[in-house]
Design a protein with these regions (language model features):
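Pyridoxal 5′-phosphate
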Residues: 1-155
Length: 155
């Protein structure tokens, strides 16, 4: 299920969709590729079984990210070497992780933390709250640069 339209920006109510789907015993996979650059998805709050997006959409390397509920991941067949059977998440990562790209994730974290420190010196909330506040700053900046175009197109 698409979390957010990449054309018009409509954010779908993934929590409600998950609730309705789970009533019918369906598994919900959230596609966050268009949402993640503009928000910080709380996958547990959304109630999805899986959530995925590309990290290059959020200032990172060209690497896919997959969240999955452990009780479902444990039931999936092994895609890796036989000696890794039952060792989630390695069972889903044939060939192993790309260490070079994974190391780039430190830069994404540092970028967000530096933005937070610059705009909120001395504050020390949770990492989730820091990222949320930085995303709000980015969203405000996006509005500032997009509004002239939107005004032009609608007038």
């Amino acid at each position: 299920v698409t979390h957010c339209s990449n054309i018009v920006g409509t954010v779908n109510n993934l929590k409600k969709i998950s609730e309705l789907a789970h009533e019918k015993n369906a598994i919900v996979i959230g596609d966050g590729v268009s949402f993640a650059p503009h928000g910080f998805p709380d996958v547990k709050e959304l109630g999805v079984d899986f959530y995925t997006f590309s990290l290059y959409k959020t200032y990172g390397p060209h690497l896919g990210l997959l969240y999955g509920k452990k009780e479902i991941l444990d039931k999936l067949p092994n895609q890796n070497h036989e000696f890794l059977e039952g060792d989630v998440p390695y069972t889903l990562n044939p060939g192993g992780p790309n260490h070079e790209e994974l190391s780039c994730l430190v830069g994404v974290y540092e970028y967000f933390m530096n933005l937070f420190e610059h705009h909120y010196p001395g504050e020390n909330p949770s990492i989730r709250e820091k990222i949320h506040k930085v995303n709000e700053l980015i969203a405000e900046h996006e509005k500032e640069i997009a509004n002239p175009l939107l005004d032009y197109l609608t007038n």
